[in-house]
Each structure stands twice: as structure tokens, then as C-alpha cells.
Amino acid sequence: MLVLGACGDDSGSASQGEASGGRAAPLSLTLTESGCDPTSLSAPAGDVKFAVTNTSGLKGEFEIISATPEILTEEFLDDGASGTFTVPLKAGQYQVICGAPSNTRADLVISGEGEAAPEVKVDQGELDAAVSSYQGFVLQQTEDLAASTKSFTDAVRAGDMAKAKQLYAQVRVPWEQIEPVAELFPDSDAVIDSRADDFPKAEEDPNFTGFHALEYGLFAGGSVDMPSLADRLDSDIQNLITQVKSLEIQPQVMTNGAAALIEEAAQTKITGEEERYSGTDLVTLQANVDGANKVFVLVSPLLATTNEQLDDDLAAQFRKVQQTLDGYKTADGFEPYGQVSEADRAKLKTSMAELSELLSQVTGSLGLQVNQ
């Protein structure tokens, strides 16, 4: 887990120097209302230390992305959260996203050789086949998302609130299942799946679009009169399909993304923050678990040859998480999240955190590069 925070820097750029005793001083970065401060960062290759604080007044997302693009680290920060973290980076050019993807980003230049990345330990042909299968899965899920969402948005446009509310949770499942790689298309993520917390005016902000804006109107606002939001969602998902068709997913993106998704679920989604208006969080959590499990199933035969114990532990941990979720299944889905006891929420949080920790070991166990 990456723990974030610390103080900002008033200058336009920052470099990693040395602290007392020869230790590398962390790069200081502030998440402001408009984005990153400073907007230019540099450090030598290797374990790069960061110190970040969020003063934006909103819950914010912090990410480092490579030119691939590949998400190298991401974290959600409450306003005022602080801390330090370290991430291994090879020489190259990166970008830092502070808050919304449209905010001012920071350019990060990593120079020098640094520590060499590990060699792939598994059969390259089998690894390529697993990645190809996953890429096909992501495209199929995205196309399924477009079709199912069209039924939902048609109900909104027709003014059929009962049908729209009935369809809402299930049409989101394909999206939630591909979230291990959703940050490869951050602009689509921002317009399809953003929360009201991401915007200065919350639910009343004109830039609040996507599933959760429609969820708010249906379940909290008591209105189905949202044809423009419905049209925008259909259009944004079509744009997503175009992006997915041209993606080349790297294996470490799959494995790191699965771990990051379950970590996010354990830290934030478990609180009920995502589906706060509809109470359909168990559907979302199940889809996230299924999405991470898809990655695991594809790499499991390879993992069994390099770290059989980890492979066994992951299979057992997925079963453990599923057992808790199964306790709240109904004939047509899941009980509302408000029905989940505090004890079971705590159990889910713990078991999903343990699952995330195990998943975070897969990339290294397969001998994959942490970043490219």
C-alpha cells in the first residue's frame, strides 16, 4: 500500500536531493484545486521518494503514469491527507495526475540507469496468450457495456424511472469488471464513473456526468428528466470502445491493476461511497472481485510455476471474499448495502485488504517489469 502526503513546494519545479545522513530527500508535491504544484519534477532512477499533500478542498486522486500509458501508482486522498511513499522508477519521462485528469499535471523526468528490472520468469508465449485473452475480454466487456447502457439510457429518455432504477446496477457490471485497466483511459474514467466529490459544486456541478450523476437523479433527486446526461453517457462509452480497440495492454498493467482495484475497494468502496444514492454497492464489489479474479485466472497457470504457494493462497482468498458476498445474495442480485452488518463490512474490508496484498505480489512473482 502507498501512503501519501506531506508538504507542497512553491517553486515551479523540484528535484530529489539529499537529506541529512545521505538519505535522498523526497520530492514534495501538493494537490491543489487546479492540479499539481510544482508542475516539473526530476529525480535519479531507482527508488524515488515522494511527499504529497492534498489541499484542494476535495477528495483527490494521485497517479504517476508512464508514456505507455501505464499506471505506476494511484491513490485516493481525502482533503488534508499527508504522508510519504516510495516507488521504483526507471529512467524516462512520466506524468503526475493530481485530482481530475483534466487538471494541471506535473512532468516527471527520471534520469540515470537505476536498478535493472527483473527478467520475465515465465514462458513468453504463454504470457502473451494470457494478455491476448484479457485484451479480448476487455473489448467484449466494453461492447457489452455499450449495449446494456443503451437499455438504461433509453429508459431515462422515455421517462421510465422504475425501469431505469431497476437496470442501473446491472448495466454497470461490465465497467466495474474492467476497472483493473480503466486508468489506461483516465479521461473516459473521469466522465463515465466520477463521483460528486470530484467537483467543486458536488452534485450541482455542471461537469458532474456519467453513471453516478444519473444515479443521483434517479435515487436521490427523484427525477428522470435527464436526457442530456443519458445522451452524453452513450457517447462517452462509444469513445471508450474506440480507445479500447487500439490499446496494447502490458501484462504488469493487468496484475498491478487488479491489486490496485481491490485495494481501492477495501479502502473506499467498502464504505458505501460509490453507490451512495442507490445502495447497490454489493453489485459493484462483486463485479470488482470478478474483474480481479479474471486477471488471476489467466495468469494462475504461470504463477503456479514460479510461486505455487502464492497461487494457492490467492485461490483461497478469493473464495473467502466470495463467501461473505454470497451471504447477501438474493434471487435477483444483492441486498441493499444498508442491510450489510458492521461486522460483515469489517470482515469484507479485512479479507479484501488481504486479497489486495496477495495480488500485489503477482507482478514480481512472474518476474514482470514494474514499469516500462
Where are these regions (language model features)?
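Beta-strand cores of secreted/periplasmic/IMS beta-sandwich domains, seen most often
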Residues: 39-58, 83-99
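Extracellular/periplasmic metallocenter environments
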Residues: 28-31, 77-119
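Beta-strand signatures of extracellular beta-sandwich domains
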Residues: 61-65
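N-terminal edge beta-strand
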Residues: 22-44, 147
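Surface-exposed loop/edge segments in extracytoplasmic proteins
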Residues: 69-75
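Short, low-complexity, disordered segments immediately C-terminal to signal peptides
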Residues: 7-28
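Mature extracytoplasmic or organellar-lumen-exposed domains after removal of signal/transit peptides
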Residues: 116-372
